[in-house]
């Protein structure tokens, strides 16, 4: 599906390149930088699945590889430090480049390293999971976890380019595919109900071209939102639908039990229930959300982990989206979204939350 989307950024513009030929597209992106040093950051899963691809990289470029353990706990300052050590040992300068090839964890981690090493070096993202292709690679957000706090340290640092190839999705486990669908449903439910309906009816096994169209549509939606509100002062906040609770679940579960898209699905259900209770969203819309989550085997309750409403509320207080005295939730409405500000001392809300979990 060779196409290109151009993203306008206040930091720097970049292209999202859709391709079936990753090596050629990467070579085109690098241009004169082909002669510079490249550090490929990936994880063990991707490295073993695509070892031939990495061997071709090594033949064509002055390339080094940093292979991370898989999983969310890799997004740590300890891993950042290990990558810094490798960059310094190989004498990387601001003229050299990082290429991330992996899911959202690798993209966020590698982007953060690029943003901070030598006060910023260029990088290219090659996302290999559905979630990273439609969500985490788009918009320039990079960062790592701090202790148990999700994405607490980070920046907005756009890449030189993002290379999207659905070929990578052929090796993606169903659970990870559903996590990507979760983020696509999020943007569809808030901003593009026709997209939501198409995802509800989509048949993965028989419609590869349909998947490519849905990916392109999801990315186009996020591109438009990011271009209007890159630094999350208004419209881009809508993309945090499900994320206040979702990030708290990830933090308390130490990024085990629930993958990101699963935690966000639970968060979306609770946000939608809150919206229904306040008369902002028809119950039929909540029912539709629950049905499509069930279809994609996404969780809608916290049955896998012993997590209390009180412990979740305590984590909410550290959320980076908060204002000084309030915890911020994004609630879906019949026509879009609104924000709900909960006082950090509102212990009655804990009881309300407990009834919704």
Swiss-Prot record:
Annotated cofactor note: Binds 1 divalent metal cation per subunit. Can use either Co(2+) or Zn(2+).
Binding site for NAD(+): 104-108, 128-129, 141, 168-171
Catalytic activity: 7-phospho-2-dehydro-3-deoxy-D-arabino-heptonate = 3-dehydroquinate + phosphate
Highest taxon listed in the record's lineage: Bacteria
EC number(s) given by UniProt: 4.2.3.4
Pathway: Metabolic intermediate biosynthesis; chorismate biosynthesis; chorismate from D-erythrose 4-phosphate and phosphoenolpyruvate: step 2/7
Keywords assigned: Amino-acid biosynthesis, Aromatic amino acid biosynthesis, Cobalt, Cytoplasm, Lyase, Metal-binding, NAD, Nucleotide-binding, Zinc
GO cellular component: cytoplasm
Transmembrane segment boundaries: none
One Pfam assignment: DHQ_synthase
GO biological process: amino acid biosynthetic process; aromatic amino acid family biosynthetic process; chorismate biosynthetic process
HAMAP family: DHQ_synthase
PANTHER family: 3-DEHYDROQUINATE SYNTHASE (PTHR43622:SF1)
UniProt-recorded name of the protein: 3-dehydroquinate synthase
Organism field: Streptococcus pyogenes serotype M49 (strain NZ131)
